[in-house]
């Protein structure tokens, strides 16, 4: 989708009346039903047993970039803030922590594609077959950001993406998505698609992973998070759930 035309920031240009909240709610639902592979774990041992007792998620700690360089990090923050721009009610991708989420993911197993089969041959497949590149996610970002910076400095009189006005940033992103902007040494459309997917994931992920800071996305769409008990609400229909969302780390928003 062309982000600036769909109006993630405010109202949709192509679909009048679709609000930012409605569009992001649709995005959240699509992420839940995306083609992510499922996995199961056999739990063995004697009782008592408690969920996640052996491998609780490690919360992302604030601090300097882990994978990105300083210039790459600044570019990613500018990019995610155009994919999900701020509005008076909700922070944009940068303040929601999407760039931090992506940085930490690229520094870990996801960035190295440890759970994917990455041996050849590598040939172009159909869209239904997904990514067929030899590049890991981390390598695609490094390659794509370098190519994007080179393109911007060549086309915009030495300016980086960060230095461009918002309308030029939006035009460039739309061109990447439509495959109308060609980056030297990188697949611009594939880079855009990877970036958009990871930005959406960071916006809606549990805050323990670095994005969705202060559960802003969950609060916006009314998602209760990881609450374990809804027995008091089973028979209560068409009522807004009043309690704040809860992270898998146990913290309420």
Protein language model annotation of sequence segments:
Residues 17-20, 69-76:
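Onset of an N-terminal alpha helix
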Residues 1-18, 29:
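N-terminal secretory signal peptides
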Residues 181-253:
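Long, amphipathic alpha-helical surface segments
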Residues 3-4, 40-60, 64, 231-253:
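Terminal targeting/low-complexity segments that flank the catalytic cores of oxidoreductases
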């Amino acid at each position: 989708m062309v982000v600036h035309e769909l109006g993630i920031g405010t109202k949709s240009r192509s679909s009048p009346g679709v609000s930012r909240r409605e569009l992001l709610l649709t995005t959240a639902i699509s992420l839940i039903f995306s083609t992510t592979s499922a996995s199961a774990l056999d739990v063995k041992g004697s009782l008592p047993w408690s969920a996640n007792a052996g491998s609780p998620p490690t919360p992302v700690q604030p601090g300097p970039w882990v994978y990105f360089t300083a210039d790459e990090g600044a570019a990613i923050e500018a990019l995610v803030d155009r994919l999900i721009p701020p509005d008076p009610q909700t922070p944009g991708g940068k303040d929601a922590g999407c760039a931090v989420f992506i940085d930490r993911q690229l520094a870990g197993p996801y960035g190295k594609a440890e759970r994917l089969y990455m041996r050849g041959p590598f040939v172009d497949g159909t869209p239904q077959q997904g990514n067929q590149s030899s590049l890991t996610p981390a390598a695609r970002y490094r390659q794509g950001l370098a190519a994007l910076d080179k393109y911007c400095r060549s086309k915009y009189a030495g300016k980086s993406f960060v230095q461009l006005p918002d309308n030029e940033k939006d035009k460039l992103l739309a061109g990447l998505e439509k495959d109308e902007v060609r980056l030297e040494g990188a697949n611009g459309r594939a880079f855009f698609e990877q970036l958009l997917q990871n930005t959406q994931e960071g916006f809606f992920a549990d805050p323990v992973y670095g994005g969705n800071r202060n559960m802003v996305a969950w609060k916006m769409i009314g998602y209760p998070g990881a609450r374990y008990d809804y027995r008091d609400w089973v028979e209560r229909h068409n009522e807004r759930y009043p309690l704040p969302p809860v992270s898998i780390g146990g913290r309420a928003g």
